[in-house]
Amino acid sequence: MSMQITRQMLSAGAAMLGFGSVSSGSRAAFTLPPLPYPYDRNEPAIDTQTMRLHHDAHHANYVNNLNQALAAAGGGWASRPLLHILANLDGIPESVRAAVRSNGGGHANHSMFWDVMGGKGGRPAGELAEAIARDLGGFENLQNAFNNAGLKIGGSGWVFVTVDKAGKLALATRPNQETPLTEGGRVLFGNDVWEHAYYLKYQNRRADYLKAWWSVLNWDRIAARYAAAKAGALAI
């Protein structure tokens, strides 16, 4: 995949998700991205009802609340790309900064979440598999460390695999709707361990949810995100 094609693909994806391009400065409001596959695509690991509620209600609330907070912020913040907003939170008025941080993070995290699912699981291949072996001890070690990290989160949060421009991978966790994007990081993929992501099917069995989630990852899409990150073109 050429760098030019990767940039075009990620730019188109960002526009579809309502982010705008990183350099754009004119957008009226953020919008809820359409789910890129049917609601039942991730059955049986993630049930259809959970997908509907998670996308149509929970994610939609983050988008709506983000737009309200940015409108209250003034100063042209509502027209700026999400990546720019999250990387420059110190410039947001203190009265709405926490709301922008939480809801902007929720919008970014969930948009990434939908993007990396809808697949058939399996194993990564090629350059991505090599990077996982180099930086994270191999696929099985990654799965174990990732799942254990998810179990250790007290309350709500996310488990991420982050990637830098050199292609180096790292495991990270964040509480609530925090995101590495606020620190200049980039997310390759991540899992939502808020109860709304799994409780209808798994109740308190978070471990079962974490294990099942790997079966719906789209490794082709994640590999494309990896290539884009190395090209400096992964927006969210």
Question: Where on the chain are the PLM-derived regions?
Answer:
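C-terminal segment of N-terminal export signals and the immediately downstream linker at the start
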Residues: 21-46
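N-terminal targeting pre-sequences for secretion and organelle import
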Residues: 208-236
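An amphipathic alpha-helical core segment
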Residues: 148-205, 211-220
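All-alpha RGS (Regulator of G-protein Signaling) helical domain and cognate RGS-like helical scaffolds
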Residues: 45, 57, 68-165, 170-171
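Short helix-capping/linker segments at secondary-structure and domain boundaries
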Residues: 21, 115-124, 201-206
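Structured secondary-structure scaffolds
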Residues: 52-63
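Pocket-edge structural micro-motifs
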Residues: 34, 55, 173
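N-terminal export signals
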Residues: 2-26
